[in-house]
Amino acid sequence: MPDFRDPATLLRHVADTMAFYHPRCVDPSGGFFHYFKDDGAVYDTTTRHLVSSARFVFNYAQAYRHFQDPAYLEAARHGLAFLRDAHRNPDTGGYAWEVCWERGKARPLDATNHCYGLAFVLLACAHAYQAGVAEARAYIDETFALMEEKFWEEEHGLYADQASANWKERDPYRGQNANMHACEAMLAAFEATGAPHFLHRAEELAHNITVRQAALADGLIWEHYHADWTIDWDYNRDDPKNLFRPWSFQPGHFTEWAKLLLNLERHGAALRASSDWLLPRARALFDAAVTHAWDDQYGGLAYGFGPDGSVCDDDKYFWVQAESIAAAAVLAVRTGDASYWDWYDRLWDYSWRHFVDHRHGAWYRILARDNSKLSDEKSPAGKTDYHTMGACYEVLKVFAI
């Protein structure tokens, strides 16, 4: 296995992953293709999902900043224009969750507004701006204002999740996932602009999910809540593999939060309150994830475990391993605790052997518990290898500190 403690190795891996997508993912008529088989063949040319549309902008903006290829910057601009022109409804300001793109025109397939989607629009705008797309600066403020107006619930200090296309109906479902990615986006917006209100919103989201809400579940983070932010233990119990709202504790979200908490800590002097709580919570969440979810027999972290602590979904997902790699590195550098380097190496060894496609590039999306493949669909809507390349960028960032 390559030495993933070497920054050059991480950059090579990003370049190899980008090579799976670029340039085949770019649709000259607008945006990107979103559905790829293992060998890179596109198996759906028209369906465009907001999450993929935004994540591709992140991918290209980050790639441009690290590799300085003008084609990457052009692709980031191309993707940002698609978000604005195809997903965004100029009459409502909302963003369609899914559109059909044919002959240069977008037709909404699902015009529902999701806070999760807006978080990724904000993330895309922030990274595009950092890459040099000047017009993205105004889009950052516009998207934040939309999230605040339509989804922010001051009495709970968190964002609601979903609203109708015309914004008149707000779904009673509340979820931690949208708030976690909103925190990520707010951090990116702060780092892009220096505007403190983004950092303070990220700080509030992080505390309210990982401390206040976690206190309702013995310090762990449940995914689903009622409108008053009491835990809904039964939501999607009959649909445990739901793509964005699975029933279970999600160890991948524990480690993702651990990473975000320590990203917040880096800006400790600019936070509103003490940063003393961030490291202990990050360690506790990471440690809970690997304790409950690591598979001693086949390796890798399982997807989900139930309230009783037992694994309820033993499939292995690419993003769970990737986010845990990033969190392990951040914790290792922050604490000096060698056990986190052990986890970093163990997770890379597992992922390199089972998830990385050494023939065609990029990572497989999902494997069975025994690491056998479940599908030849490497990158359906939502994947884009944003998590895998993002993890590499995160590790590169902490190596540079």
Indicate where each model-derived feature is located.
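Glycan-recognition and catalytic cores of secretory/periplasmic carbohydrate-active enzymes
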Residues: 1-401
